Amino acid sequence: MASTAMHSEPSAAAVPRHLAIIMDGNGRWAQRRRRPRVIGHRAGARAVNRTIDFCLDKGVSALTLFAFSSENWGRPQDEVDALMKLFLHALDRGVEELQRRGVQVRFIGDRSRFTAPLRDRMAGAERITAANTRLVLSIAASYGGRQDIAMAARALAVEVAAGRLQPEQIDEALLASRVALADLPAPDLFIRTGGDTRISNFLLWQLAYTELWFTETLWPEFDAGVLQQALDDYAGRERRFGLTSAQIAEKATEASSA
């Protein structure tokens, strides 16, 4: 759950390089105000902008947002249509500002289900911002973690069938090179808003050693204060990657004396 501890500023080492977020709670936020769910999604878009601002300010180098899962296509059609319109509007209006601020935009997921105009806007946003280096913003849209792993396995199977790869050459590193976000460091910190405590088929491979942080805060209410709580909690955690605390301490001592 969300930590209530607050510090003025985490050290540079405590700032995650890569932050991954499930943005949950737009619909409930709107329902509590007796408004249509699409109003919640619009409010959620403003929370995205606040989160980008925070990452740029703190020096986070990669931000991955779960915008629309492969399972979300099963939602009521009017909600899906409204989300697609909002997505298209955001691409039309927001890319220039992201370009100005040095944000590189990427999309991961199955684009084939989107309309041609939306696919064109997605490709255009990636092309326009490709050279930016301040922050890599990856939008997971029509994405599923199992689907991601299956596609990576399929790509390796094609190489085996073509004789370019032997089955015994396939290992974790090779599979990791085929999943989404392969060129980025694995997420250091995962955040889910809205109170649920599960990862919902998001980045299943990539989150293997990621620190998980959950908050009751609904996504439209997510702001720098809540993000700072997450970073404060993250700063106090010991990331062992399968080692013991003593081994981690020994490595830290060796690094400081080198």
Curated annotation (Swiss-Prot):
Protein EC: 2.5.1.31
Gene Ontology molecular functions: ditrans,polycis-undecaprenyl-diphosphate synthase [(2E,6E)-farnesyl-diphosphate specific] activity; magnesium ion binding
Binding site for Mg(2+): 24, 211
Alphabetic keyword roster: Cell shape, Cell wall biogenesis/degradation, Magnesium, Metal-binding, Peptidoglycan synthesis, Transferase
Sections of the chain in a coiled coil: none
GO biological process: cell wall organization; peptidoglycan biosynthetic process; polyprenol biosynthetic process; regulation of cell shape
Gene3D superfamilies associated with the record: Decaprenyl diphosphate synthase-like
Keyword Ribonucleoprotein attached: no
Cofactor(s) essential for the protein: Mg(2+)
List of residues binding substrate: 25-29, 37, 41, 69-71, 73, 75, 192, 198-200
Presence of the UniProt keyword Kinase in the record: no
Similarity comment text for this entry: Belongs to the UPP synthase family.
NCBIfam families from the UniProt entry: uppS (TIGR00055)
Function: Catalyzes the sequential condensation of isopentenyl diphosphate (IPP) with (2E,6E)-farnesyl diphosphate (E,E-FPP) to yield (2Z,6Z,10Z,14Z,18Z,22Z,26Z,30Z,34E,38E)-undecaprenyl diphosphate (di-trans,octa-cis-UPP). UPP is the precursor of glycosyl carrier lipid in the biosynthesis of bacterial cell wall polysaccharide components such as peptidoglycan and lipopolysaccharide.
Name assigned to this protein: Ditrans,polycis-undecaprenyl-diphosphate synthase ((2E,6E)-farnesyl-diphosphate specific)
Organism of this sequence: Xanthomonas campestris pv. campestris (strain ATCC 33913 / DSM 3586 / NCPPB 528 / LMG 568 / P 25)
Gene: uppS
